[in-house]
Amino acid sequence: MNIIFYHPFFEAKQWLSGLQSRLPTANIRQWRRGDTQPADYALVWQPPQEMLASRVELKGVFALGAGVDAILDQERRHPGTLPAGVPLVRLEDTGMSLQMQEYVVATVLRYFRRMDEYQLQQQQKLWQPLEPHQHDKFTIGILGAGVLGKSVAHKLAEFGFTVRCWSRTPKQIDGVTSFAGQEKLPAFIQGTQLLINLLPHTPQTAGILNQSLFSQLNANAYIINIARGAHLLERDLLAAMNAGQVAAATLDVFAEEPLPSMHPFWSHPRVTITPHIAAVTLPEVAMDQVVANIQAMEAGREPVGLVDVVRGY
């Protein structure tokens, strides 16, 4: 079995040695430009166009993250980048659910207890108690009800919040109100005080966080974007905050990363920025999942995390 690995950020040595210890009979190598030697499986993140284009012999391509938008965007721009008929598999969790829960709970409670406002008051040396938010008037809406969306919804419900989710197709989540389909999006948005985006990035979801959506939220709503920067129209968010429609936003992902130093988000008092760290891939857990999927495919079984390339997730 031949496996090729490419990731522009991960430490290749850690992955190569970890995979080799789990698959001792496999030939595993780091892919470099000009490498056209045979491969059965490719483990990639943001692969160069030429890496996969001619590899019709591949049994599977593994995206080393929860999202596959980078690969599918490249396929849309350069058809044939992803060999036709080759299964595309994404990581399902690899420790991301817990990390995402931690990030979201910390951020939600910061807004719910108005810590962001007290921090601004501290800078002004202002001692002024604020009216506390009430659970029954602080409905949380989650765009996306996949593995991460469900995990976050369950955790927030444990804190006594009213939680609702919106997704492309209906989902059943205990203790959470579910909305599905484009026609139900307005009903989902109306009454939402804090909106969390956990949607997959597809052509249909790009730009979904826009002025039209913001205008339907409760006044002084909060935004948390931890999915993809392409979901957010940044100018629309700035306008909504400056108009008072959106009270504050926590953003982990951006249209351009790293965020340019002159971007207005950096200096906006109501924007909290984190450098795409809400949930990161944990190598050891990810390797276990990839290897288990390779073994399943070798045995003729369907892997966990198989992507529908038409839907985009």
Swiss-Prot record:
Report which reactions are catalysed by this protein: glycolate + NADP(+) = glyoxylate + NADPH + H(+); (R)-glycerate + NAD(+) = 3-hydroxypyruvate + NADH + H(+); (R)-glycerate + NADP(+) = 3-hydroxypyruvate + NADPH + H(+)
Among the GO molecular function terms of this UniProt record, one is: hydroxypyruvate reductase (NADH) activity
Catalytic residues as annotated in Swiss-Prot or TrEMBL: R228, H276
Q: Give the UniProt keywords, A-Z.
A: Cytoplasm, NAD, NADP, Oxidoreductase
Q: Does the keyword NADP apply?
A: yes
Where in or outside the cell it occurs: the entry states: Cytoplasm
Q: Which Pfam families match?
A: 2-Hacid_dh_C
The record's Gene Ontology cellular component field reads: cytoplasm
Report if keyword Oxidoreductase is assigned: yes
EC number, as in UniProt: 1.1.1.79, 1.1.1.81
Query: Which InterPro entries does its entry note?
Result: D-isomer_DH_NAD-bd, GhrA_Enterobacterales, NAD(P)-bd_dom_sf
What NCBIfam families is this protein classified in?
Answer: PRK15469.1
Q: What is known about what this protein does? A: Catalyzes the NADPH-dependent reduction of glyoxylate and hydroxypyruvate into glycolate and glycerate, respectively.
| Similarity comment | Belongs to the D-isomer specific 2-hydroxyacid dehydrogenase family. GhrA subfamily.
Protein name as catalogued: Glyoxylate/hydroxypyruvate reductase A
- What gene is this protein a product of? ghrA
